[in-house]
């Protein structure tokens, strides 16, 4: 799963984890491949205390889901150069303040000035919990958090949260809520990344899980053999992901990249109580689907570098490049009930996506201007933090 899937909102209707990202409603139009703009942008600004107006030093300022970021100087100033044009989410965070973010759609190669005034916040609760004070209940909550946040794939087995003591857990029977008082430091030795994850909210209740946060990636240093292994693993994580799909759709060659697209009308098959289709690669019996072309769901945008997804119902995606993994089929069996699909043998990786907020704009990089408009399920949603690569990643 690519990080352009925006790990902001997950819904877990028993057999599928649903993830928020951005999409639209149904129209058949002809369109061309979006143009790639020339030049780069520069982001500058000042970060201040909202109450006093004083500049804030050493504030994290970064482009979410990327490797690009910086920190403010003594005057609260920041400057990020060489930013590709298109859609980005600029995120600002400092301990003791409410984080802030702004969605950007950079269409011109120029300097953009974005100032932030952060609101002070009092962090309630106890300080860092030492190992000896973490009781059995804490360990149970943490284990559940790891499964739902890091994931249950082979890559998750090589991914470690280095500072779990910054997590705060709440919740009663069957529910779990969490947030971090400092960025989570996650080391992914499967893909070769150190990730700072700024987790604002995590909520898991029976049948539903969601979390909201922003990752900043940094490549790990490694030996020649390690770098070769990471390069292979990153390619595997990218191929078949939602970001791979978006780039293939923009290039109008989905089949060449191994994707088959189908439309399922909203009235076909069964939907869960939250208004979304059941995940896990299929609907309950009775759902109808028919093959579609990219032009059936995508139209020209306002400018030549953008396209707009626009459809009703939901799109089912079959990736012929890989079959379902054993970890995925085990996950399905674990969460499936008698009324849902069970998978006896692996099939090609199958996912769905549908609209949350109406038409959504995609830039030439495959990034969504509004990161919250689309929900995905099936294999796209099964792969979580341990399978993310930075949004600018492209296979070499």
What are these regions (language model features)?
Residues 11-25:
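Bacterial N-terminal signal peptides
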Residues 27-42:
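Beta-strand-rich domain onsets/edges
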Residues 41-49, 76-78, 116, 127-128:
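A short, amphipathic beta-strand motif
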Residues 41-43, 50-65:
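Short, ordered, surface-exposed loop/turn motifs in non-cytosolic proteins
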Residues 63, 91-103:
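A short, solvent-exposed loop/turn motif at the edges and junctions
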Residues 66-77:
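Short, acidic Ser/Thr/Gly-rich low-complexity loop/linker segments typical of extracellular
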Residues 70, 98-114:
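Structured interaction patches on ligand/partner-binding surfaces of diverse proteins
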Residues 118-396:
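Surface-exposed, low-complexity/disordered segments
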């Amino acid at each position: 799963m690519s990080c352009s899937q925006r790990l902001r909102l997950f819904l877990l209707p028993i057999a599928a984890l649903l993830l928020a990202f951005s999409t639209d409603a149904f129209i058949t139009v002809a369109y061309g491949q979006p143009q790639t703009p020339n030049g780069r942008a520069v982001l500058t600004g000042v970060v201040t205390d909202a109450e006093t107006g004083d500049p804030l030093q050493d504030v994290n300022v970064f482009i979410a889901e990327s490797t690009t970021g910086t920190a403010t100087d003594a005057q609260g100033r920041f400057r990020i150069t060489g930013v590709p044009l298109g859609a980005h989410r600029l995120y600002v965070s400092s301990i003791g303040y409410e984080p802030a973010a702004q969605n950007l759609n950079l269409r011109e190669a120029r300097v953009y000035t974005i100032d932030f005034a952060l609101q002070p916040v009092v962090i309630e609760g106890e300080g860092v919990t030492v190992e000896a004070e973490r009781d059995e209940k804490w360990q149970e909550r943490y284990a559940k958090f790891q499964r739902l946040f890091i994931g249950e794939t082979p890559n998750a087995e090589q991914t470690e949260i280095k500072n779990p003591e910054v997590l705060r857990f709440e919740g009663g029977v069957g529910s779990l809520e969490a947030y971090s008082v400092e960025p989570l430091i996650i080391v992914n030795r499967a893909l070769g990344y150190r990730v700072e994850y700024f987790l604002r909210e995590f909520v898991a209740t029976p049948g539903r899980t969601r979390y909201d946060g922003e990752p900043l990636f940094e490549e790990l240093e490694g030996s020649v053999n390690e770098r070769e292994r990471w390069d292979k693993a990153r390619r595997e994580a990218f191929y078949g992901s939602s970001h791979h799909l978006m780039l293939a759709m923009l290039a109008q060659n989905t089949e060449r990249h191994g994707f088959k697209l189908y439309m399922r009308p909203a009235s076909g098959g069964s939907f869960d109580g939250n208004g979304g289709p059941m995940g896990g690669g299929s609907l309950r019996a009775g759902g109808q689907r028919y093959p579609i072309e990219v032009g059936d769901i995508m139209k020209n945008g306002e400018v030549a570098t953008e396209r707009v997804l626009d459809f009703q119902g939901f799109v089912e995606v079959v990736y012929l490049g890989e079959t379902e993994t054993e970890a995925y089929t085990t996950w399905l069996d674990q969460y499936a009930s008698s009324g849902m699909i069970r998978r006896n043998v692996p099939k090609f990786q199958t996912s769905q996506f549908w609209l949350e907020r109406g038409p959504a704009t995609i830039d030439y990089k495959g990034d969504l201007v509004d990161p919250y408009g689309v929900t995905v399920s099936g294999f796209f949603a099964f792969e979580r933090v341990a399978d993310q690569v930075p949004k600018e990643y492209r296979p070499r």
